[in-house]
Design a protein with these regions (language model features):
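Secondary-structure boundary elements
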Residues: 27-172, 208, 390-565, 613
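Hydrophobic/aromatic-rich core segments of domains that either
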Residues: 32, 132-133, 137, 142-148, ...
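Short, ordered, surface-exposed loop/turn motifs in non-cytosolic proteins
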Residues: 282, 290-311, 330-332, 532, ...
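Short Pro-Gly-centered beta-turn/loop motif in secreted/extracellular proteins
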Residues: 321-334, 338-342, 348-352, 661-688, ...
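Structured interaction patches on ligand/partner-binding surfaces of diverse proteins
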Residues: 341-363, 686-715
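Short active-site neighborhood of thiol/selenol oxidoreductases, capturing the structured segment around
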Residues: 742-770, 783-787
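Short, internal strand/loop/helix patches
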Residues: 799-834
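Thiol-/selenol-based redox modules, centered on thioredoxin-like
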Residues: 833-872
Length: 872
């Protein structure tokens, strides 16, 4: 070894030793500081006294120095010790383990938590299953291989916002993107590959969001689509959408000192901005002033329009001179500043303005209408090159991996089995079938529960009030606890099951708590609490210490642990009140729309619990009369898709979480709503992703009804011809099992042509969007031709998932990719990435094109069709 190289290695070794020493010093100080908190000092002392080697001790102290309060209380010391042991094994047993620097190991391998999922023993399970599979591989090849393994276990399907644990996703065999990426990161970390979940909180060019995985390979962060394996890194269906992203970020456990732009820091994690890894960015400087122009230190929220609300993608505080900044993609943000009862907002076109001044020129109680035209970034799609051999090999692997997952899914309960069980139990076949098929790999839990239930109809009533996701991961212990330990009030109504027996309170992983709390509460004056639930609220307020700053992700602490530790964050305290009330037989809930904690003396007689003010309050409500004149394009506007209402509390809008239903059901006949100040937001999404937004501010008073209009702005731009496409092109038609021209199938006039991939998140979204307006497509009557790349692709398609497609849809394959090639060339598409949907006519004119990930595609196409009909 030459002298120069020896010197470099020596310097690197010294630097590594210095970095480790600095890390250890910081952790020791932070661990000691947190140990002074008397509510958790017992746990901290237990960790400090563990007999561990130096590496294990540092790792345990690192975790306990920064973990959120619910993670410390809800999981045992032994659980984290197991995770530490397996994480350290990867440094010795994986070929790349010794090459991972301490910074990447401690922040991106060791941490157990990835998102807001329930923690489980996936690290141990995944390590044991994957260690031989990746043995001897390079770090890069191992990351690609782990993602193939992930695809064998899990594929994409939408679900609710609660994040399943990695093992629950495996049991279910599907998950939404947040669950796939949580699972993918867990698998990578299990074999010692530094990994993190990258998240765009909301897209700017379309509704919804997305999450994926970044892995640290050979000194550089690179990305992949979780459970969506490609032949190389930095390739996924979201390359193009991400190039239009306004904000992409990740939460890094602990005190992280990396090269990325820091968005925020707290006791538990450092939030970093990784947008520049995917899209061109610029720095937007904001100055907040009062109505006289003087600088103000205020809360500043950077927002994008998404699902009919202005959603915060980054939150900061302006300094004493009124300044703050954000680095984001090159599109429009709404900058909303607030302090006390004053607020103001402005549009910021990132990259086009030097400094945007936001004046706090409005007060709570402001009424009026503000219109905003919001433009997203333009697409800049770049993808790494692939050989045809790489593409073909990967396709074959995907088919094989689908078959592995399919064999497992074939073990689930089917309709015939569910019918046999239902008839044997004497229960309604449709209900039992829904529960058992919906439980996926968790069917044995439900069968055991119903089979042993003393009152089987009552057991069904319990299953009826938990979510579909709960069916897939609920434990027998939870079901039995709430079935056998819920007080019998002689009330068999749905109100009783929803607000007393129901295990679910908020968006938590449901837990057994009734038997535990009943035994614990017997030491108190339960009779007095039941006679006056406000006395229970007073007890909670006076005896549960609220610890601020140690739960920034708003995780939910188990009610049993709140009792045990006598501390929690504010939201977990609220949940504890409801849990205790239900355990005593008091009707109680956390209202899904407003988030208020309430108890009821009788059906629908709800009383608010306000821990901060200790007031006894029954909500005062007023009447909202919202008028809407239906149009041919939009008969029944949907909440979230077309409009939302937010309450403007302290100058800041807080969304009302109504169900995803239409105007006709929720507001047409008027609605009761709490007194206060509100903003009604509507938006019209244009074909290029831009939004015509409208904000209507109004107040609600109990003494007078409030009249407001539900108005949607429209574009004056008529439908235009944007390209040409030959309607005589041939495809293979599945129905007739023959080669046909598009024209022979569609007949004269306008038609829709779609090119999709199987088991592909953007394609699945497109088809589900078409399903959501199937009746309107059928009323229109035009053909919708949906083509796969080849026969193998059609075999991988989950046909059973799309049973509600319009009856005007025909399926087939694109012969030798000729149609895809022509569309790419004729419409100047940057690639042939699917899905591609066009509206064209048999005079070969194209008037609409959509490529890639788009939410609301069905409605966009219906709007174009209505415009075409208006022009006749």
């Amino acid at each position: 070894m030459n002298a120069k190289r020896l010197m470099v290695l020596t310097l690197l070794l010294v630097a590594a030793i210095g970095a480790t020493a600095a890390l250890k010093d910081t952790v020791e100080k932070d661990f000691a500081l947190r140990s002074t908190n008397k509510q958790v000092s017992g746990v901290m002392n237990k960790v400090a006294k563990l007999k561990l080697n130096a590496d294990e001790q540092l790792a345990m102290k690192f975790l306990y120095s920064y973990m959120p309060l619910p993670d410390m209380t809800d999981y045992s010391v032994d659980f984290y010790k197991m995770n530490v042991e397996y994480a350290l094994r990867t440094r010795k047993e994986m070929t790349w383990g010794s090459k991972v620097p301490d910074r990447e190991f401690y922040h991106f391998v060791l941490p157990v938590r990835i998102n807001n999922e329930n923690l489980d023993e996936s690290r141990r399970v995944f390590f044991e299953e994957l260690k031989e599979r990746v043995k001897g591989m390079s770090m890069r090849d191992a990351a690609l291989e782990v993602n193939h393994w992930c695809h064998e276990k899990v594929t994409y399907r939408p679900s609710d916002s609660r994040t399943s644990s990695p093992l629950a996703s495996v049991k279910t065999a599907f998950g939404r993107c947040g669950e796939e990426s949580t699972f993918g990161v867990a698998a990578m970390r299990a074999v010692g590959i530094p990994a993190r979940q990258v998240y765009t909180p909301r897209w700017a060019h379309t509704d919804d969001n997305h999450a994926w995985v970044e892995v640290w390979i050979d000194g550089k962060w690179q990305f992949l689509g979780a459970c969506e394996p490609e032949p190389v890194l930095n390739l996924g269906w979201f390359n193009a959408p991400a190039s239009r992203g306004m904000m992409m970020h990740t939460k890094v456990f602990g005190r992280y000192e990396g090269p990325e732009d820091v968005m925020s820091k707290n006791n538990c994690f450092t939030e970093i901005n990784v947008t520049e890894n995917y899209a061109p960015t610029a720095k937007a400087v904001i100055r907040v002033v009062d109505e006289k122009g003087a600088p103000v230190s205020a809360r500043v929220d950077f927002k994008v329009y998404n699902y009919a609300e202005l959603y915060t993608v980054c939150r900061k505080q302006s300094d004493k001179d009124g300044y703050t900044y954000v680095t984001s993609g090159l599109g429009d943000l709404v900058v909303w500043a607030s302090k006390g009862n004053r607020f103001g907002f402005e549009k910021c076109s990132v990259g086009k303005q030097d400094t945007v001044v936001v004046a706090l020129d409005k007060t709570v109680g402001f009424s009026g209408v503000v219109e905003l035209d919001l433009v997203p970034p333009v697409e800049r799609n770049t993808v790494p090159p692939l050989t045809q051999e790489q593409i073909d090999v990967n396709k074959k692997r995907l088919v094989y991996e689908d078959s592995i997952r399919g064999v497992y899914e074939a073990t689930f309960v089917n309709e015939a089995k569910a019918k046999t069980l239902a008839e044997g139990w004497g229960l309604p076949v449709d209900k039992v079938t829904h529960f058992l098929i919906g439980s996926r790999g968790n069917y044995a839990t439900l069968i055991s529960f119903i089979n042993k239930a003393s009152d089987k109809q009552r057991a069904l009533n319990l299953l009826d009030v938990i979510s579909d996701k709960d069916l897939r991961d609920v434990s027998l212990e939870v079901l039995n606890d709430h079935f056998y330990n819920t007080p019998d009030l002689g009330d068999g109504s749905k109100f009783y099951f929803e607000n007393v027996m129901n295990p679910r309170i908020d968006n938590e992983m449901i837990e057994p708590y009734k038997a535990y709390l009943q035994k614990a509460l017997n030491k108190l004056n339960v009779k007095a609490f039941k006679a006056d639930p406000y006395k229970w609220a007073d007890w909670v307020k006076n005896n549960i210490v609220v610890i601020d700053g140690w739960n920034p992700q708003n995780l939910r602490m188990m009610p049993t642990k709140v009792w045990q530790y006598r501390c929690s964050d504010a939201d977990s305290r609220d949940m504890f009140f409801v849990a205790g009330a239900r355990a005593m037989g008091i009707y109680a809930r956390k209202d899904l729309v407003t988030g208020k904690v309430q108890w009821a003396s009788a059906k629908d007689e709800w009383h608010d619990v306000q821990f901060e003010t200790a007031e006894q309050v029954t909500s005062v409500q007023g009447d909202l009369k919202m008028a809407y004149t239906k149009t041919q394009r939009l008969d029944d506007p949907k909440y979230y898709y077309h409009f939302t209402i937010s309450k403007v509390d302290d100058g800041y809008p807080v969304l009302l979480n109504y169900p995803e239903e239409g105007y006709n059901d929720m507001f047409k006949g008027g609605a009761k709503i709490d007194e206060g100040n509100y903003v009604l937001i509507t938006g019209t999404r244009l074909g290029n992703g831009s939004v015509l937004a409208r904000l209507c501010f109004f107040g609600i008073n109990h003494s007078n009804a409030t009249d407001t209009d539900l108005v949607f702005r429209t574009s004056d731009t008529d439908v235009q011809v944007i390209g040409n496409f030959n309607s005589e092109d041939k495809y293979y038609d599945f129905a007739t099992k023959s080669t046909k021209s598009l024209l022979s199938t569609t007949g004269r006039g306008y038609y829709i042509l779609g090119l999709i991939n199987p088991n592909h998140e953007p394609s699945n979204h497109a088809l589900h969007d078409i399903e959501s307006v199937a009746a309107e497509f059928e009323q229109w009557g035009g053909k919708i031709v949906v083509l796969f790349a080849d026969e193998d692709a059609s075999k991988r398609h989950k046909w059973a998932e799309f049973k509600k497609m319009p009856n005007t849809v025909v399926y087939g394959t694109d012969l030798n990719g000729a149609i895809a090639d022509e569309l790419k060339q004729a419409l100047n598409l940057g690639s042939d990435n699917r899905p591609i949907f066009v509206i064209a006519d048999t005079f070969n004119r194209v008037v609409f094109v959509s490529q890639g990930y788009t939410i609301g595609l069905g409605e966009q196409m219906i709007n174009v069709i209505h415009k075409l009909n208006e022009g006749k």
